[in-house]
From Swiss-Prot:
Protein name: Argininosuccinate synthase
Location, primary (coarse class): cytoplasm
UniProt source species: Methylibium petroleiphilum (strain ATCC BAA-1232 / LMG 22953 / PM1)
Top-level taxon: Bacteria
UniProt entry tagged with the keyword Magnesium: no
InterPro entries, sorted: Arg_succ_synth_type2_subfam, Arginosuc_syn_C, Arginosuc_syn_N, Arginosuc_synth, Arginosuc_synth_CS, Arginosuc_synth_type_1_subfam, AS_cat/multimer_dom_body, AS_multimer_C_tail
Residue sites binding L-aspartate per the record: 131, 135-136
Gene expressing this chain: argG
This protein's record includes keyword Ligase: yes
Amino acid sequence: MATILQHLPTGQKVGIAFSGGLDTSAALHWMKLKGALPYAYTAHLGQPDEPDYDEIPRKAMQYGAEKARLIDCRAQLVAEGLAALQAGAFHISTAGVTYFNTTPIGRAVTGTMLVAAMKEDDVHIWGDGSTFKGNDIERFYRYGLLTNPALKIYKPWLDQTFIDELGGRAEMSAFMTQAGFGYKMSAEKAYSTDSNLLGATHEAKDLEHLSSGIRIVNPIMGVAFWRDEVEVKREEVTVRFEEGRPVALNGIEFADPVALLLEANRIGGRHGLGMSDQIENRIIEAKSRGIYEAPGLALLHIAYERLVTGIHNEDTIEQYRDNGRKLGRLLYQGRWFDPQAIMLRETAQRWVARAVTGEVALELRRGNDYSILDTRSPNLTYQPERLSMEKVEDAPFSPADRIGQLTMRNLDIVDTRAKLGIYAKSGLLSLGSGAALARLQNDDPS
């Protein structure tokens, strides 16, 4: 039996990741009418744009689900989000502004926890709303099969019969209305939004055009800081970490990481912190564009990175950043639980995060405009007296020590000059006019 089913398996249990939106509502009711036994599973991810989570399973039952369950994924989502933070698992950035991989983290949690819930109900066929052009179809495929090796995949959006009958949103709305549910399409936005409590993604439609930008977006986790009429006041904030874990905001300790992140979202959101506009490579290598929000993670990231740079040495920081970019790509590709990702993540959590204890004070202004006001940690290797321009007692090194250190540099300076001479003789370098520095020649042998 094929892993991916191209036609509806009638008479069998079919699990569907049910959001309560038009697409999954129409798909669920259509599967019921065609003879399948739909089971609906909804992930509670703390979506900031979802007003009533408990209503979603009730809708699924009305539309024909044999069973509908709401799976609380918030604790696991925050745990994975903080693991990504500790490892710096973020590979997409533009001019120093970071995308925090909030959607890939959400898919890792959703893909595993929903399929695990389906196994409890003896459901081994799974469908979701991802399209064939996106990243999620591969992420869910990988996480689903990792969780249940017997899993089969059925997606209505890959079934030509479903496409022929309900190929667009207008057809789906008419189908639901005709079935007596009175379903009305929500007003079409100029873009689509996907969110969880870690962050929000705005993409597609008008945002596919690079001539459109952040100004058409209505933030759901913060304020439109680019609008002059939006008042944003300066705010001082403190963030405290213990062994790599954020534990306090503004002096208030949080035993529950979910509660801490929600408060971080509120603080960062008041300023529009963590919004970014990114062009990225999808898994299939085609480029896409998204506008992202992640106010809480952005706040924690600033404080965490400040402590990392004050505590660890240069080589450790280099490995942390290099491995973080590699891990970010693996996370983006749906490989968060692959052995190579676990190796990189565990290394950072053990040898980088464990030493990160301390408190950072910041002043937040508009958007990503902030200043660091203070950094305190018992583990700081930053010690100003080591490099003070004033006289200090028991100085760690003397002028004579530095003379000796510089003299040792003569060895590699001599070697470097010799190499430059070799390159000059071979025609790769020439002396610049009026200067003793070598210049690169044209590498064209002709």
